[in-house]
C-alpha cells in the first residue's frame, strides 16, 4: 500500500529474504505483512527511493539485518546525502510525503555486489540502463526473476507497459542489453516491483524493448511539455479504469519521464540532431 493505492509498489519475499522493501512511507504496510521476525536479508535491485528508502529504518529496527546492493549504490546507503540532494531536486517539498525519511545504513551491514555472485539462493546480474546501480536476481529454485525497474511498469489488470525513465542514468542501449541478459535466464516468471508477477516473459520483454524505443524517439522529437501531454493522452487512450490510471501515474509520474530521456539524448548530440524536424 503506497499513499492509499495497493498496486503501486510491491516488496517480494522468498524464504525470509525481502527484495526491495520500498519507501519508508509504506513501511507500516510491510511490517504488518512480515510481523516481528527479522528478515534473513534485504536484497536491493537499486537504490531509487521507491525501492529502497525503507532500508535504513529497517536496519535501525533490526541492527543485524544484512543488505545486498550493487557496488555503485552501496556508498549512498551508508551516506545518503548525495542521494537526498538529487531527490530533492526532483521531488522538491513532496520528497518526504512520497518516500518518507531516508536513514543511513551502517557500513558493516552493507554487502556490495558487482554481478555474477550467488547470494542466498539468488543469482545476481548487473543490469544498467534504468539506473547505473541496478541488478536483477534470479531465484534458482523457482526460476523467478526479480527485475526491479528493468522490465518496466505494468499495473494489473491493464496490459499497458511503460518503462520508467527518470534522470540521470537512462541509457537505452544498456537497458536493451540488460533485457537480453534477463531473457537469457529463461525465467519462469518476472517479479515486477510495479506491479506483480508476469508469466508471459518473452512477450512482456519484447514490449518493453519496443516501448523503450518509442518513448526515446517521442522525447527526441518533442519538448518536455509536449511530450508529457502526448504520453498522458496515449496512456488515457489505453486505460479507462480511473483507479488503474491513478496507480500507474503514481508508479510512473509523467513529470519525470522526459528528463531521463532528454539527458540520454543530450549525451548523443549527433543522434539527437538527426531527429525528424530537428534544425
State where each predicted segment sits.
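Short histidine/acidic/glycine/proline-rich micro-motifs that form metal-
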Residues: 72-76, 197
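Active-site metal-binding motif and surrounding structural segment of the metallo-beta-lactamase
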Residues: 28-72
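Conserved beta-strand hairpin/beta-sheet module of binuclear metal-dependent hydrolase folds
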Residues: 1-37, 137-149
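Active-site neighborhood of phospho(di)ester-bond hydrolases with catalytic His/Asp-centered motifs
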Residues: 19-22, 40-47, 68-70, 127-129, ...
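Metallo-beta-lactamase
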Residues: 77-126, 132-202
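Histidine/acidic-residue-rich catalytic or RNA/ligand-binding cores of hydrolases
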Residues: 201-210
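C-terminal regulatory/interaction regions
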Residues: 218-279
Amino acid at each position: 500500500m503506497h499513499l492509499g493505492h495497493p498496486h503501486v509498489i510491491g516488496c517480494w519475499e522468498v524464504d525470509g529474504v525481502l527484495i526491495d522493501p520500498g519507501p519508508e512511507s509504506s513501511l507500516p504496510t510491510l511490517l504488518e505483512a512480515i510481523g516481528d521476525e527479522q528478515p534473513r536479508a534485504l536484497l536491493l535491485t537499486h537504490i531509487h527511493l521507491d525501492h529502497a528508502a525503507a532500508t535504513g529504518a529497517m536496519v535501525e529496527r533490526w541492527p543485524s539485518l544484512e543488505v545486498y546492493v550493487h557496488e555503485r549504490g552501496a556508498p549512498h546507503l551508508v551516506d545518503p546525502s548525495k542521494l537526498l540532494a538529487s531527490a530533492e531536486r526532483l521531488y522538491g517539498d513532496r520528497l518526504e510525503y512520497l518516500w518518507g525519511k531516508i536513514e543511513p545504513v551502517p557500513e558493516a551491514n552493507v554487502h556490495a555486489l558487482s554481478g555474477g555472485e550467488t547470494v542466498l539462493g539468488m543469482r545476481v546480474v548487473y543490469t544498467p540502463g534504468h539506473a547505473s546501480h541496478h541488478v536483477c536476481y534470479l531465484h534458482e529454485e523457482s526460476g523467478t526473476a526479480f527485475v526491479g525497474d528493468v522490465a518496466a511498469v505494468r499495473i494489473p489488470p491493464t496490459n499497458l507497459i511503460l518503462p520508467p525513465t527518470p534522470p540521470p542514468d537512462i541509457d537505452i542501449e544498456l537497458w536493451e542489453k540488460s533485457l537480453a541478459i534477463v531473457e537469457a535466464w529463461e525465467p519462469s516468471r518476472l517479479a515486477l516491483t510495479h506491479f506483480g508477477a508476469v508469466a508471459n516473459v518473452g512477450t512482456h520483454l519484447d514490449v518493453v524493448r519496443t516501448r523503450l524505443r518509442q518513448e526515446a524517439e517521442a522525447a527526441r522529437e518533442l519538448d518536455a511539455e509536449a511530450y508529457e501531454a502526448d504520453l498522458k493522452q496515449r496512456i488515457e487512450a489505453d486505460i479507462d479504469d480511473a483507479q488503474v490510471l491513478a496507480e500507474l501515474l503514481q508508479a510512473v509520474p509523467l513529470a519525470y519521464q522526459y528528463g531521463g530521456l532528454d539527458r540520454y539524448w543530450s549525451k548523443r548530440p549527433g543522434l539527437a540532431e538527426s531527429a525528424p524536424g530537428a534544425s
